[in-house]
Regions:
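Acidic, glycine- and Ser/Thr-rich low-complexity intrinsically disordered tracts
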Residues: 34-55, 137, 144, 148-159, ...
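Bacterial N-terminal signal peptides
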Residues: 10-24, 606-608
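Right-handed parallel beta-helix
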Residues: 200, 209, 231-242, 254-269, ...
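Right-handed parallel beta-helix/beta-spiral solenoid domain characteristic of secreted/periplasmic
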Residues: 57-58, 85-88, 117-123, 129-243
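Juxtamembrane/start-of-transmembrane alpha-helix segments at the extracytoplasmic/lumenal side
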Residues: 588-606
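Right-handed parallel beta-helix/beta-solenoid
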Residues: 29-96, 100, 114-131
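C-terminal membrane-anchoring or membrane-association module
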Residues: 608-628
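Glycine-rich beta-solenoid repeat tracts in large extracellular/virion proteins
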Residues: 162-164, 177-183, 190-196, 222-229, ...
């Protein structure tokens, strides 16, 4: 969710850096696209299985041209099955078919065609649903909103509140959603379990290709598809596009599968999963999204109390998928216990990112994700210069060309970065091919606890600990050819138990390039020791954090180099792409900073941390004022 975005991770470092170097702080933009406070499922659910194309408990949806589309299919069992399903078609709308379901584990077969759900997109709201801001019987207290720090423009006509209680979602499902699957029929009790006929619903496209069935929101609603407390839901074999917030949104759900889905051309997210467990995302293709293609945020924190590097189990698995041509391929605040493997994250601005920044998200600080056996490469797309600076993203949403490849980044992120860990713990980045990322192959830095409204002094340094990056191939393609990263590993020297070892590199002697000013040590010896984060390294993020694509002044903040395209690395080794990392050498972390000395740097860190504690409270008050 925008509220859970990784990339304003800069906000955190920016605050600290600005204080340390005398910066003026941040101007807090307006909040937008809030969501209700969410909780984790109880973990008793399970991953559902596909019920096939012959489930007797089914509904069939078709369009007027479905017959012609089926006629053009090549002969074979799939064509015969589609012709048989066509004879049973009783619905022209997916939502209408969902509304007719009376028993769990019902399949909704969607025949080839384009579905805009005009009936529901244009349906007149009831008196109650049209006046939720003042008339809601189940209002959502502003204090419980999961808020936002950015203020993208709104392409939808949102005259009412956009953070609704679950009870109001049930009563007004089309206020924000084109298609809504709401499984909890008892919204007024404390349970979030799926307990009604929509449990186990399967939405299945019956075409040969994922693009044979297209669900086109046309920016009519905030979300194209919402599955809320819908345990056992299964999505398969279709394309969903043109949502302002999420194309496919799964919330507070225990047990789900998203398989062979294309999510494209959305202002923010392709696939967003939040506060969910027992989930599988596989064989998806996400592109042209202004935030991330795949977002597993606040995944069930089943390892939150686990102080071992190995997780007890994972809550969400992502495999055999592609995420490309987005601002980020993958992101997630509190993306806990997520296992992403055998995927391709390429041609985004940043490939993978996770963070512990935003308050209100269950499961903070982030922990125990694993990214292994992925291809993470060529994440150098500069959509800031291509579309934000040129004014394309200032046009009305429907005129920006999202279905022609326009991407309007909602968030600031460092162009040219493969993997970004902003304040995560116990994460494993291993056995990946990370290459041709012109800024950094991997990047890791600390997130002070006050930035998530945690003021217990003992937790100040509770992020950026016990992460391991090992057995990765840096700057080398799978075929063995060279495609250098700008810098293989960037780290702010903060945190305990972090280690980087057994990684190979395209650079001289096969040794990865780093900006490390302290030796983290081997994993077997416990990794890094405690050292306060180097202000010289983090301070450069201040200007970037003020990015706001809807504000002409801050569309490209002055002196922000994150939105500059790094030059393609050459065989001449460089530890300092674009000058963004402090020069590393015998003089240590203060090198390149006139008049800076290690003692001064340490003093600044101490002063800065005290000020951050105060700024956290100011930030919380400013967000409350904006929402009010």
């Amino acid at each position: 969710m925008r509220t859970t975005r990784t990339h304003v991770v800069l906000v955190l470092v920016a605050m600290l850096g600005g204080l340390l170097l005398g910066g003026s702080g941040l101007a807090g933009p307006a909040a937008a696209h809030e969501e209700r406070e969410a909780g984790f499922p109880d973990g008793t659910g399970k991953r559902p299985s596909f019920l096939g194309l012959d489930n007797p408990r089914s509904r069939v949806v078709c369009r007027p041209d479905s017959r012609d589309r089926i006629a053009r299919m090549p002969s074979g069992p799939l064509k015969r099955r589609n012709k048989a399903l066509l004879r049973k078609c009783d619905f022209g709308s997916i939502q209408s078919a969902v509304n007719s379901i009376t028993r769990p584990r019902t399949s909704v077969y969607v025949l080839p065609g384009k579905y805009t759900e005009r009936r529901w997109a244009r349906a007149k709201k009831s008196e109650y649903c049209a006046n939720l801001r003042t008339e809601s019987e189940n209002p959502l207290p502003v204090s419980s909103y999961i808020g936002s720090l950015s203020s993208p423009d709104s392409g939808a006509d949102e005259t009412g509140p956009i953070a609704l209680s679950y009870a109001d979602q049930v009563r007004c499902p089309q206020n924000l959603n084109l298609i809504a699957i709401l499984g909890d029929t008892t919204p007024h009790n404390k349970s979030m379990k799926c307990d009604g006929p929509l449990c186990g619903t399967q939405i299945v496209g019956t075409g040969r290709k994922r693009t044979d069935v297209v669900i086109d929101n046309k920016f009519s609603k905030l979300n194209a598809i919402r599955a809320d407390r819908a345990g056992g839901v299964y999505f398969r074999n279709f394309t969903v596009q043109q949502a302002e917030f999420n194309a496919l949104y799964v919330l507070e759900t225990d047990g789900f599968v998203i398989d062979r889905v294309v999510a494209r051309g959305n202002d923010e997210y392709g696939i967003l999963v939040f506060a969910a467990d027992h989930g599988l995302i596989q064989r998806v293709d996400t592109y042209w999204n202004g935030d991330s293609g795949i977002y597993p945020g606040s995944a069930s924190d089943i390892n939150g109390d686990n102080e071992e590097f190995e997780p007890t189990r994972y809550s969400i698995e992502i495999r055999r998928s592609k995420s490309h041509h987005n601002a980020l391929g993958y992101s997630g605040t509190a993306g806990n216990s997520v296992w992403a493997h055998h995927n391709r994250f390429f041609k985004n601005a940043t490939g993978i990112a996770t963070d512990s920044l935003f308050p209100g998200h269950p499961g903070l600080p982030q922990d125990h994700a694993r990214w292994n056996d992925n291809l993470i490469y060529s994440n150098n797309q500069n959509y800031y210069k291509r579309y934000v600076d040129t004014g394309v993203c200032a046009k009305p949403m429907e005129e920006r060309g999202y279905m022609k490849g326009t991407v309007c980044p909602v968030i600031p992120t460092p162009v040219g970065t493969g993997v970004l860990i902003a304040g995560g713990n116990y994460n494993s980045t291993d056995n990946n091919h990370i290459f041709d990322n012109w800024r950094y192959g991997t990047m890791q830095f600390w997130v002070p606890a006050p930035l998530r409204d945690e003021y217990d002094p003992s937790k100040l340094y509770d992020t950026s600990n016990h992460n391991r990056a090992f057995q990765n191939s840096m700057g080398i393609r799978p075929d063995g050819s060279v495609a250098h990263n700008g810098l293989d590993h960037w780290w702010d020297d903060q945190g305990v138990g972090n280690c980087w070892e057994d990684n190979t590199s395209s650079r001289e002697g096969g040794v990865p390039t780093t900006n490390f000013t302290v030796d983290p040590g081997p994993c077997a010896d416990g990794g890094s020791q405690f050292v306060p984060g180097a202000p010289v390294k983090d301070a450069g993020f201040l200007s970037c954090s003020q990015y706001d694509r809807s504000d002409p002044t801050w569309r490209h903040p002055p002196e922000c180099e994150w939105f500059e395209s790094p030059e393609k690395p050459t065989d001449e080794q460089s530890d300092n792409p674009l000058g963004l990392a402090a020069p590393v050498g015998p003089s240590g972390p203060s090198a390149g900073v006139p008049g800076a000395a290690p003692a001064l740097a340490s003093a600044l860190v101490g002063v800065g941390l005290m000020l951050v504690l105060g700024l956290g409270a100011v930030r919380r008050r400013s967000l409350t004022a904006v929402r009010g």
